[in-house]
UniProtKB/Swiss-Prot annotation:
Listed Pfam families: NDUFB10
Keyword Electron transport attributed: yes
Keyword rRNA-binding carried by entry: no
Principal subcellular localization: mitochondrion
Source organism of this protein record: Arabidopsis thaliana (Mouse-ear cress)
Name of the protein in its database record: NADH dehydrogenase [ubiquinone] 1 beta subcomplex subunit 10-A
Family: Belongs to the complex I NDUFB10 subunit family.
Keywords, comma-separated and alphabetical: Electron transport, Membrane, Mitochondrion, Mitochondrion inner membrane, Respiratory chain, Transport
Role this protein plays: Accessory subunit of the mitochondrial membrane respiratory chain NADH dehydrogenase (Complex I), that is believed not to be involved in catalysis. Complex I functions in the transfer of electrons from NADH to the respiratory chain. The immediate electron acceptor for the enzyme is believed to be ubiquinone.
């Protein structure tokens, strides 16, 4: 009995029952969506960390030529760090925006 070959199967998509217009409609789907967002953020953060280590290694190995030889890694690292963070400014407005106020009409 050995290990199965291949990669494990993970659920990588957003939850099916989540409604961004009314996120509190289904609390289970809302929690699953929040966990999905956090998981995706961690993946992006870890990718940026790996690229940062590659850039450090390239700078050490290439020495004075690192401007030309490591440019592609630096560009990948800068692209990976854009938009990565935990602030509200990177989340969809429907998840953190002001709640609409119901206006009652006078008859």
């Amino acid at each position: 009995m050995g290990r199965k070959k291949g990669l494990p199967e993970f659920e990588e998509s957003a939850p099916d029952g989540f409604d961004p217009e009314n996120p509190y409609k289904d609390p289970v789907a809302m929690v699953e969506m929040r966990e999905h967002i956090v998981r995706e953020k961690w993946i992006h953060i870890e990718k940026a960390k790996i690229l940062r280590e590659k850039v450090k290694w390239c700078y050490r190995v290439e020495g004075v030529n690192h401007y030309q030889k490591c440019r592609h890694l630096v560009q990948q690292y800068l692209d990976a760090t854009r938009g990565v963070g935990w602030g509200k400014d990177h989340r969809p407005i429907s998840l953190h925006g002001p709640k609409p106020v119901a206006v009652e009409e006078a008859e």
